[in-house]
Each structure stands twice: as structure tokens, then as C-alpha cells.
A protein has these predicted regions:
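Anion-recognition interface
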Residues: 1-381, 386-390, 420-424, 458
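Canonical positions in the second alpha-helix
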Residues: 369-370, 403-404, 437-438
């Protein structure tokens, strides 16, 4: 039976999240049309496939990242490979096309070996594979990316020149396309332009569905397609200032301020202060795009020969001069954010007396809110774990314990309970990770030592 696979690799800020939300929420409708959207690599984004393919383990990040489910990268990826193989083996015969999507493919698979690893993971399940990648004019991409950088904790004043590290692997589009073409074959790589005609309506979800050969009624899915909305310019600058305040309080804090506190702060800012964010000037944007003129031209010649230029060369919608956010706008943003946090009420609340007082008030309120939220979230996770335990639902029990560890990675009780569950299920790798994590911080912990002894006993038991 012939089966093909469409591999959507991003890039970022080209509607990937909207595509993934629609695909994940319409799995049944897609299956009726012969398309299969896997769930084991992720309910929406298939980020676990990215992690499984990465040759550079340094990109895994902290072993306590939510993606690792409380058991670290090695154990989680081992479980994923088993789950993925089982899911692929059970694809209904009538599904002749598999669709895989994650913008992290283009962001994190930065070398040919990583791309080859992904190819080898997917090759057993498809006779042909086609890579789809959306490209966006570089200055427009960065302006959109800035809000995301703030959410990630990389809170610096916007400057196109500071993007050089990203640009080396992200904005040279001919290098990006060639890396995937070397592995999958040039005729199986299909670049698409994000909003290819200036001033016309472009819907990336509709475009991708057309590429997949699918048809869905999208009128009832409008809410699913709104994702990663921009933060207003004042909100962005407020976050930059708050990040500076966090760094000043903690001299050991590095450039990145990502933390549960920061995630809550950026979520509140996104909700309270949406709008058009920072934009470069016309001259800045033009100079930035011109850096990649040769690369863009090669992509145009190879894949878009009928176009005069790869991207629309019109920069007139951008400001001529830099747009600054004054103290009054920042104070207003701080007041609105505090109202969203529940620390002030009503539109008549007095603004902070000056800029620094506003920042300090928001940060202090945020710290108090984060502590209260952490207690509340942990209480919910505790209740969920107990309910799942009572019901005998081991998967939900594990998920609730992993949630507790996301809230507090130092929660030894939750980690040991999770270890015991995995040991009972026969997953020694996951159990060993949890036990080792406790013993690294609490070398003589009796509960951890007891589980370590059980692990040793199971490894030496006759089979």
C-alpha cells in the first residue's frame, strides 16, 4: 500500500500554531479524507520528533522542562519512540497520507545529521516524503518574533543587529532549504511564501490544507486559529524594564529570565496589553533584508522563477523614524497590567507616581501572585493525582505528578511517587531518572534509597 508523508517544518511566525490547532482538532474529519495527524509526538505540535532527531543534546535544555514529563530526556524519548512506533503501526489502512508539523524542525535541526535523523525516524512509515516550509520576509519575521522572544525570557530592547546568532541559521533561507534538500531531495522540498502578494488576503491554514489535499469548514474554527498574538509596543517595553528589574534583584540572573514567574507575567501582559508591537524603521528593515539579498535571490531562482523578487520590496508601511514609548505610556501599561493581576480595580485606579515605582509595583504584585498561583496549582495537581490514584487511572496519575514537578522541580515526594509508578509499570529508565534526581540533591534520602534498592533487585532478577 502506497503512503506518503507531508512534513511541515515552519518556519516560526508563519502561522504554524494555527495550522497545528486546526489539524489536531479536526483529526476525525481529516481521517475521513485519508489524512492522519499523529498524536504521540504531541497533541498539536510534534515537538517530540524534533527532540528525538536532534544531534546536539545541549539543545535539550533543563531535564525538568515540561516536555520531559518529570522523567528527563532519555527516559521520555525512549517512551516516545515506543509510543510513536505503536501509533504508526496502527494507522488505519484508509489513511494514505500522514501529516507531521513542528516549527522546531527548522529552528532546532541546524545540521545535516539532525535532519537525517528525522528522515530515518519517518522513512519506515511512508513511501514518499515532502517537506513544506513557509518563508517570511526577514524584517517582518523578526518584528513578529520579538513578542515571542520576550515570552521565552530573552527580554532585551529590540535591535535587528542583535539577531545575528539567530540569523546565521534562521534567516539565510537558501542554507535552510539546501539542508533539507540534501537529505530529502530537492524535488521533495516545497518552499511557500507567507503572504506572497502585498495587500491581498492570505490564510496560511487554507494554503496548507490545499497542499495536503484536504478540505475543512474553517468557519467554526476561528478561535483555534488565533495564536501567539502580539503584545503592544508599550507592553513589550514594560516587559523589558521588568526583566531589567529582575536582573538587578538577582546578580546571578543571566540574560534569560525564563521562570514560572516570568511565564505568568508574560501571559498576563499578552492578555492585558495586546496590540501592534515594535517595528523597525524603513531604513533598518531594508538594510536587514539586503543582508540576505543573495540568499533570497537563489531561493527565488530555484523555486519561484516567475517572481521578480522573492519578497515584496515595499517598506512604506514602516515608520521613517524610531517610535519611542514615553513614561506616560509605560505607566499606563503598568496600571493596566496591575488591574489584570487583580491588584487594582476599575479604570479610575491611580497610575504609579513614576516609572520605577510602576515597575516595582508590578513586579512585587507579580511575585505575590505567582506564589499564590503556585500554591493553588499545586493543590489542584495534588487533588488530580489522588483522584486518578483512586480511580486506578495510572496515566492520569503520572500526568498529575509531572504537573506538580513542573510547578516545583524540588518536590521530592512527587518525584518519588512518580518513580514508584514507573517502576511498577516496568519502565526502569524513567524510575531510575526520578530516583537519581532525588539522590543528587538529597544523597541519603531513605525513600530514594529504598527505590534504588528495588531497582537493583529488578535488574538482577532472573527473567
Amino acid at each position: 500500500m502506497q503512503r506518503d508523508l507531508i512534513l511541515h517544518i515552519g518556519t516560526s511566525k508563519t502561522g504554524s500554531t494555527s495550522i497545528q490547532r486546526v489539524m489536531s482538532r479536526q483529526r476525525t474529519a481529516l481521517a475521513r479524507q485519508g489524512l492522519y495527524y499523529p498524536a504521540s509526538p504531541g497533541q498539536e505540535s510534534h515537538v517530540l520528533l524534533t527532540m528525538a532527531a536532534m544531534a546536539d543534546r545541549r539543545l535539550y535544555g533543563s531535564p525538568d522542562r515540561p516536555i520531559w514529563g518529570g522523567i528527563g530526556p532519555d527516559a521520555r524519548l525512549a517512551r516516545f519512540r515506543d509510543e510513536f512506533a505503536s501509533e504508526m503501526a496502527a494507522i488505519p489502512a484508509e489513511c494514505r497520507r500522514i501529516v507531521v508539523s513542528a516549527e522546531q524542525f527548522s529552528m532546532l535541526l541546524r545540521d545535516t545529521q539532525s535532519v537525517q535523523n528525522l528522515h530515518d525516524l519517518l522513512r519506515p512509515y511512508a513511501d514518499t516524503m515532502t517537506v513544506v516550509v513557509y518563508l517570511r520576509r526577514q524584517d517582518q519575521h523578526f518584528a513578529s518574533l520579538f513578542s515571542e522572544m520576550l515570552r521565552w525570557g530573552d527580554a532585551q530592547a529590540p535591535d535587528l543587529l542583535t539577531m545575528q546568532p539567530y540569523a546565521q541559521h534562521g534567516y539565510n533561507y537558501v542554507n535552510l532549504v539546501n539542508r533539507w534538500a540534501r537529505v530529502f531531495g530537492r524535488r521533495f522540498v516545497r518552499p511557500r511564501l507567507y503572504s506572497p502578494v502585498a495587500g491581498t488576503r492570505f490564510d496560511v491554514v487554507e494554503d496548507f490544507l490545499q497542499v495536503c489535499g484536504a478540505s475543512l469548514d474553517l468557519t467554526a474554527l476561528s478561535s483555534a486559529r488565533v495564536a501567539n498574538s502580539s503584545i503592544s509596543h508599550a507592553g513589550q517595553m514594560l516587559l523589558v524594564a521588568l526583566a531589567e528589574r529582575i536582573r538587578s534583584r538577582d546578580p546571578a540572573q543571566g540574560r534569560n529570565v525564563q521562570s514560572p514567574l516570568w511565564r505568568k507575567l508574560t501571559a498576563a501582559t499578552s492578555a492585558a496589553l495586546p496590540g501592534t508591537g515594535w517595528r523597525p524603521t524603513q531604513a533598518e528593515a531594508r538594510a536587514f533584508v539586503e543582508r540576505y539579498g543573495a540568499s533570497n535571490e537563489l531561493v527565488r531562482q530555484r523555486y519561484f522563477p516567475k517572481r521578480q523578487t522573492l519578497f515584496d520590496p515595499d517598506f512604506s508601511a514602516l515608520p521613517l523614524q524610531p517610535v519611542a514609548v514615553d513614561d506616560a505610556a509605560l505607566s499606563d501599561a503598568a496600571t493596566r497590567l496591575m488591574a489584570a493581576l487583580g491588584t487594582v480595580t476599575g479604570p479610575q485606579a491611580a497610575p504609579p507616581p513614576d516609572r520605577q515605582a510602576g515597575f516595582d509595583a508590578v513586579l512585587d504584585a507579580m511575585l505575590a501572585q505567582a506564589e499564590a498561583a503556585a500554591r493553588q496549582h499545586d493543590g489542584v495537581a495534588v487533588a488530580a493525582a489522588r483522584l486518578a490514584q483512586t480511580a486506578g487511572d495510572r496515566q492520569r496519575h503520572r500526568t498529575a505528578l509531572a504537573t506538580r514537578l513542573q510547578i516545583d522541580p524540588a518536590n521530592t515526594a512527587a518525584r518519588l511517587e512518580l518513580a514508584a509508578l514507573y517502576l511498577e509499570d516496568g519502565d526502569r529508565r524513567a524510575a531510575a531518572y526520578c530516583v537519581g534526581a532525588v539522590l543528587r540533591t538529597h544523597p541519603g534520602h531513605p525513600g530514594a534509597l529504598a527505590l534504588q534498592h528495588r531497582l537493583a533487585a529488578t535488574s538482577s532478577a532472573p527473567h
